Amino acid sequence: MTELNYISTLVIYYMKGRDYLIKEVIVVEGRDDITAVKRAVDAEIIATSGFGINAKTIERIKEAQKRKGVIILTDPDFAGEKIRSIISKRVKGVKHAYISQEDGLRAKDGNIGVENAKPEVILKALENAKITLEEKQEFFNMTDMYYFKLTGSSDSKARRQLLGKILGIGYGNANQMVSRLNNYGITKEEFIDAIEKIKKQLGE
């Protein structure tokens, strides 16, 4: 897999478009932040749901850090810094990306957050965190989801829940699961091993 370091990230990103994605998993606070980040870059993203961050989310962030590395991009306010501190204490070695309050300000109501930042602001913040770009890999697709009953079956949701728990990548719909399997670097061997464990748990 080809990787490109942060030094020329902006240039390469605009040259290559979405043939590359950010290697690290980005941690934000909420769904609106996810939308804003996805306007700027292609990456896996975890939302903490604000102060609602729980043990499951921490474990998922730990797994992401182990597999791909993590970049924290929380709001430039007290709550954002508190969440950043909580994660940093529990997950060692994470990278940090910051936007200024000015860049995160929504003028009409004074709201401050990542959700209000322009794509170029977010991309620059991530570049400053020394991101790595890697070529997209598609080892898994929707055919796998159907074949292994992760979609299209009456118990597909339960199977995806178990798969996410076993692999440490969290629950998602079929499309989200395909994305995570590819972007987290899950191997075919890990996947098949997880499928076998699911079958045993379901008594098959």
Q: Could you say what each language-model-derived stretch is?
A:
Residues 22-23, 47-52:
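Short, flexible loop segments at the rims of nucleotide/cofactor-binding pockets, characterized by
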